[in-house]
Protein backbone atom coordinates (compact mmCIF):
# COMPACT_ATOMS: atom_id res chain seq x y z
CA UNK A 1 0.00 0.00 0.00
CA UNK A 2 0.98 3.63 -0.38
CA UNK A 3 0.98 4.02 3.41
CA UNK A 4 3.45 1.14 3.86
CA UNK A 5 5.70 2.48 1.10
CA UNK A 6 5.69 5.95 2.66
CA UNK A 7 6.53 4.47 6.07
CA UNK A 8 9.38 2.41 4.58
CA UNK A 9 10.74 5.49 2.78
CA UNK A 10 10.56 7.53 6.01
CA UNK A 11 12.44 4.81 7.89
CA UNK A 12 15.09 4.64 5.15
CA UNK A 13 15.46 8.44 5.20
CA UNK A 14 15.78 8.44 8.99
CA UNK A 15 18.40 5.67 8.86
CA UNK A 16 20.38 7.54 6.20
CA UNK A 17 20.21 10.77 8.21
CA UNK A 18 21.30 8.92 11.35
CA UNK A 19 24.22 7.31 9.48
CA UNK A 20 25.30 10.68 8.06
CA UNK A 21 25.02 12.27 11.51
CA UNK A 22 27.11 9.47 13.03
CA UNK A 23 29.79 9.87 10.37
CA UNK A 24 29.86 13.65 10.76
CA UNK A 25 30.03 13.41 14.54
CA UNK A 26 32.98 11.01 14.57
CA UNK A 27 35.88 12.77 16.23
CA UNK A 28 38.80 13.65 14.00
CA UNK A 29 41.77 11.39 14.57
CA UNK A 30 45.46 11.58 13.76
CA UNK A 31 45.00 8.09 12.28
CA UNK A 32 42.08 9.00 9.99
CA UNK A 33 44.17 8.72 6.83
CA UNK A 34 45.61 5.29 7.72
CA UNK A 35 43.64 2.48 6.04
CA UNK A 36 40.45 4.45 5.34
CA UNK A 37 38.94 1.24 3.92
CA UNK A 38 38.71 -0.11 7.47
CA UNK A 39 35.64 1.95 8.45
CA UNK A 40 32.24 0.46 9.24
CA UNK A 41 28.85 1.89 10.11
CA UNK A 42 27.68 -1.14 12.07
CA UNK A 43 26.76 -0.65 15.73
CA UNK A 44 29.11 -2.21 18.29
CA UNK A 45 26.20 -3.76 20.20
CA UNK A 46 22.74 -4.90 19.25
CA UNK A 47 19.71 -4.75 21.53
CA UNK A 48 17.99 -7.05 19.03
CA UNK A 49 20.52 -9.82 19.66
CA UNK A 50 20.28 -9.38 23.42
CA UNK A 51 16.47 -9.61 23.31
CA UNK A 52 16.58 -12.87 21.35
CA UNK A 53 19.01 -14.47 23.81
CA UNK A 54 21.46 -15.40 21.07
CA UNK A 55 24.74 -17.04 22.04
CA UNK A 56 27.82 -16.59 19.86
CA UNK A 57 30.26 -19.45 19.41
CA UNK A 58 33.73 -18.15 18.55
CA UNK A 59 37.11 -19.60 17.74
CA UNK A 60 40.35 -17.63 18.06
CA UNK A 61 43.85 -17.99 16.63
CA UNK A 62 43.03 -20.13 13.60
CA UNK A 63 42.80 -21.29 11.02
CA UNK A 64 44.54 -24.37 12.36
CA UNK A 65 44.93 -28.07 11.71
CA UNK A 66 41.55 -28.48 13.46
CA UNK A 67 39.62 -26.09 11.20
CA UNK A 68 38.14 -28.72 8.88
CA UNK A 69 37.11 -30.95 11.82
CA UNK A 70 35.48 -27.98 13.54
CA UNK A 71 33.63 -27.09 10.35
CA UNK A 72 32.40 -30.67 10.06
CA UNK A 73 31.05 -30.68 13.64
CA UNK A 74 29.40 -27.31 13.17
CA UNK A 75 27.72 -28.55 10.00
CA UNK A 76 26.62 -31.76 11.70
CA UNK A 77 24.80 -29.77 14.40
CA UNK A 78 23.69 -26.92 12.10
CA UNK A 79 25.58 -24.35 14.17
CA UNK A 80 27.17 -21.15 12.90
CA UNK A 81 30.27 -19.65 14.51
CA UNK A 82 32.67 -16.78 14.18
CA UNK A 83 36.34 -17.42 13.53
CA UNK A 84 38.72 -14.68 14.71
CA UNK A 85 41.77 -15.53 12.66
CA UNK A 86 45.51 -15.02 12.57
CA UNK A 87 45.87 -15.55 8.84
CA UNK A 88 48.88 -15.82 6.57
CA UNK A 89 49.28 -15.81 2.82
CA UNK A 90 49.79 -19.56 2.42
CA UNK A 91 47.57 -21.60 0.11
CA UNK A 92 46.52 -23.75 3.07
CA UNK A 93 45.34 -20.72 5.02
CA UNK A 94 43.49 -19.32 2.02
CA UNK A 95 41.74 -22.68 1.53
CA UNK A 96 40.64 -22.80 5.17
CA UNK A 97 39.39 -19.20 5.09
CA UNK A 98 37.42 -19.99 1.94
CA UNK A 99 35.95 -23.11 3.59
CA UNK A 100 34.89 -21.11 6.66
CA UNK A 101 33.19 -18.49 4.50
CA UNK A 102 31.61 -21.05 2.15
CA UNK A 103 30.04 -22.80 5.14
CA UNK A 104 28.34 -19.54 6.11
CA UNK A 105 30.39 -18.72 9.17
CA UNK A 106 31.65 -15.25 10.06
CA UNK A 107 35.32 -14.36 9.88
CA UNK A 108 36.87 -11.61 11.95
CA UNK A 109 40.32 -10.13 12.36
CA UNK A 110 42.31 -11.22 15.39
CA UNK A 111 45.87 -10.38 14.31
CA UNK A 112 48.36 -10.98 11.54
CA UNK A 113 51.28 -11.65 13.87
CA UNK A 114 49.85 -12.19 17.37
CA UNK A 115 53.08 -10.70 18.79
CA UNK A 116 51.79 -8.44 21.54
CA UNK A 117 54.96 -6.40 22.06
CA UNK A 118 54.91 -5.43 18.38
CA UNK A 119 51.15 -5.01 17.95
CA UNK A 120 50.74 -2.81 21.00
CA UNK A 121 53.90 -0.73 20.49
CA UNK A 122 51.86 2.06 18.81
CA UNK A 123 48.49 2.75 17.25
CA UNK A 124 50.13 2.68 13.83
CA UNK A 125 51.69 -0.74 14.55
CA UNK A 126 48.30 -2.08 15.62
CA UNK A 127 46.62 -0.71 12.49
CA UNK A 128 49.39 -2.15 10.28
CA UNK A 129 48.96 -5.60 11.85
CA UNK A 130 45.17 -5.35 11.70
CA UNK A 131 45.18 -4.27 8.06
CA UNK A 132 47.50 -7.12 7.07
CA UNK A 133 45.06 -9.66 8.56
CA UNK A 134 42.05 -7.80 7.12
CA UNK A 135 43.67 -7.75 3.68
CA UNK A 136 44.45 -11.48 3.75
CA UNK A 137 40.84 -12.27 4.69
CA UNK A 138 39.62 -10.08 1.84
CA UNK A 139 42.07 -11.57 -0.67
CA UNK A 140 41.09 -15.13 0.29
CA UNK A 141 37.32 -14.69 0.58
CA UNK A 142 36.24 -11.36 -0.90
CA UNK A 143 34.79 -10.47 2.51
CA UNK A 144 35.47 -7.03 3.98
CA UNK A 145 35.03 -8.16 7.55
CA UNK A 146 33.62 -5.68 10.04
CA UNK A 147 34.38 -7.61 13.22
CA UNK A 148 37.51 -8.12 15.24
CA UNK A 149 38.80 -9.33 18.58
CA UNK A 150 41.83 -7.78 20.22
CA UNK A 151 44.81 -10.13 20.63
CA UNK A 152 45.13 -10.71 24.37
CA UNK A 153 41.71 -9.13 24.93
CA UNK A 154 40.74 -5.46 25.00
CA UNK A 155 41.89 -5.33 28.61
CA UNK A 156 45.45 -6.60 28.82
CA UNK A 157 48.78 -5.67 30.41
CA UNK A 158 50.49 -4.56 27.20
CA UNK A 159 51.18 -0.83 27.02
CA UNK A 160 47.95 0.45 28.57
CA UNK A 161 48.41 3.99 27.25
CA UNK A 162 48.69 2.75 23.67
CA UNK A 163 45.92 0.21 24.26
CA UNK A 164 43.51 2.98 25.27
CA UNK A 165 44.39 4.96 22.12
CA UNK A 166 43.88 1.84 19.99
CA UNK A 167 40.47 1.23 21.56
CA UNK A 168 39.54 4.86 20.91
CA UNK A 169 40.66 4.61 17.26
CA UNK A 170 38.91 1.29 16.62
CA UNK A 171 35.73 2.64 18.24
CA UNK A 172 35.93 5.67 15.96
CA UNK A 173 36.17 3.33 12.96
CA UNK A 174 32.96 1.55 13.94
Regions found by a protein language model. Name each.
Residues 1-29:
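Intrinsically disordered, low-complexity serine/threonine-rich repeat tracts
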Residues 27-150:
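Active-site beta->alpha N-cap acidic-glycine motif
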Residues 75-77, 160, 167:
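Non-catalytic interaction surface on structured domains
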Residues 155-161:
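Active-site glycine- and acidic-residue-rich loops that bind
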Residues 163-174:
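His/Asp/Glu-enriched short active-site or ligand-binding loop at hydrolase and phosphoryl-transfer sites
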